[in-house]
């Protein structure tokens, strides 16, 4: 260390007065989790910010009740009597319910109502409840309208097909073809009054063609 550094070290003065002792106001302990020094303003916890102690598992809930909420001996005794009364009423109602269920089973046995019949009745009642709802009625009406529209569409398609067939039958091409078939029939198998069905004309022409192409019978041995 040279002389210059020695001079700077000697000229340095600490801002703290160590001879005056330690200011105890800066020292504090916080075992409760409070990180603010003594005397500093703290944030009051109200409403949602309030942290109430939560009982641990197995801890008696009564131990967490504050001193202002502690019940007196008379109040505790009254609550115990009320608790015993409620438990007795629950037990009585359970016994009454068991007796009613037994009586109900006996009535069903006498009426011949078995589990299957009861299930059918429940299903029928459930279906009636479903059909009575507005949603089911609306859906049924929608499906009915859709079916009517589909029937009308099929009917219109059939009408269009029938009209197309009639147009084809009345067309000049079809009539010319029908006349040619009739002429062929008249040449092959003779004339037939006009007005016949087109199917009959075709059948007659086919029969006539089969007759003309039938082979001649062979001569018997006697003619020889």
UniProtKB/Swiss-Prot annotation:
Biased segments, Low complexity type: 203-213
Modified residues (Phosphoserine): 36, 40, 176, 223
Coiled coil: 62-114
Entries under Pfam families matching the protein: TPD52
Tissue expression as described in the entry: Isoform 2 is expressed in colon, breast, prostate, pancreas and kidney tumor cell lines. Isoform 2 is expressed at high levels in kidney, prostate, brain, small intestine and pancreas, at moderate levels in placenta and colon, at low levels in lung, liver and heart, and at very low levels in spleen, thymus, peripheral mononuclear blood cells, testis and ovary.
GO molecular function: calcium ion binding; protein homodimerization activity
Residue ranges of the region described as Disordered: 187-224
Record keywords: Coiled coil, Phosphoprotein
Cross-referenced InterPro entries: TPD52 (IPR007327)
Keyword Repressor belongs to the record: no
Annotated GO biological process: anatomical structure morphogenesis; B cell differentiation; positive regulation of cell population proliferation; secretion
Domain of life according to the entry: Eukaryota
Family assignment from sequence similarity: Belongs to the TPD52 family.
Subunit structure: Forms a homodimer or heterodimer with other members of the family. All isoforms interact with several 14-3-3 proteins.
Protein known as: Tumor protein D52
């Amino acid at each position: 260390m040279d002389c210059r550094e020695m001079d700077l070290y000697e000229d340095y003065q600490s801002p703290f007065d160590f001879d005056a002792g330690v200011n105890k106001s800066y020292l504090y302990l916080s075992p409760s989790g409070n990180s603010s020094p003594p005397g500093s303003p703290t944030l009051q916890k109200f409403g949602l910010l309030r942290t109430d102690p939560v009982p641990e598992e197995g801890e008696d809930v009564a131990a967490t009740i504050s001193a202002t909420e502690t019940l007196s001996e008379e109040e505790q005794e009254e609550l115990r009597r009320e608790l015993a009364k409620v438990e007795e009423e629950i037990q009585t109602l359970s016994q009454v319910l068991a007796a009613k269920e037994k009586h109900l089973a006996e009535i069903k046995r006498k009426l011949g109502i078995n589990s299957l019949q009861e299930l059918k009745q429940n299903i029928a009642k459930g279906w009636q409840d479903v059909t009575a709802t507005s949603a089911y009625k609306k859906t049924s009406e929608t499906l009915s309208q859709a079916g009517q529209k589909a029937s009308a569409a099929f009917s219109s398609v059939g009408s269009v097909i029938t009209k197309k067939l009639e147009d084809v039958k009345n067309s000049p091409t079809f009539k010319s073809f029908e006349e040619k078939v009739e002429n062929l029939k008249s040449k092959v198998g003779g004339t037939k009054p006009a007005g016949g069905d087109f199917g009959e004309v075709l059948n007659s022409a086919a029969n006539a063609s089969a007759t003309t192409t039938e082979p001649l019978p062979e001569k018997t041995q006697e003619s020889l």
